Amino acid sequence: MKLKLTDKLLISEKSRPLVVAEISANHCGIKKRFLKHILIAKKSGADLVKIQTYEEKDISINLKNLNKNYNLKNNYRIYKKTKTPFSWHKDAFKFAKKN
């Protein structure tokens, strides 16, 4: 059996293992840094990049009154700063094909 993943990547039972890089919140919500991570993954030998896409409203709620006794952080604000929005996908694919 053979499976064509991209124009340049065909895999089969005899193929070497694929190297998959993951980009999550390590770009700190900066699109330019996100795109740079794609390039770094390629230069490091990754065959594919897995993008962990989320937006703050999808995984958290914006709690206004956190209990100060528990030293809680507002995860909504943290996710908002580090999100990988779906709107970045189109540019990411263009960038990856170009580079």
Describe these PLM feature segments.
Residues P17, L72-N75, K97:
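Structural/interface elements that position substrates and couple domains in central-metabolism enzymes
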Residues E22, A41:
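Conserved, mostly hydrophobic/aromatic
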Residues H27-L35, R77-K90:
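Aromatic- and glycine-enriched glycan-recognition loops and surfaces
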Residues K36-I40, D91-K94:
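Alpha-helical scaffolding segments of alpha/beta enzyme cores, especially the outer helices
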Residues K42-K43, K97:
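Non-catalytic positions within long, well-ordered alpha-helices that form the structural scaffold/packing
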Residues S44-T84:
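Glycine-rich, proline-tolerant flexible connector loops at the mouths of alpha/beta enzymes
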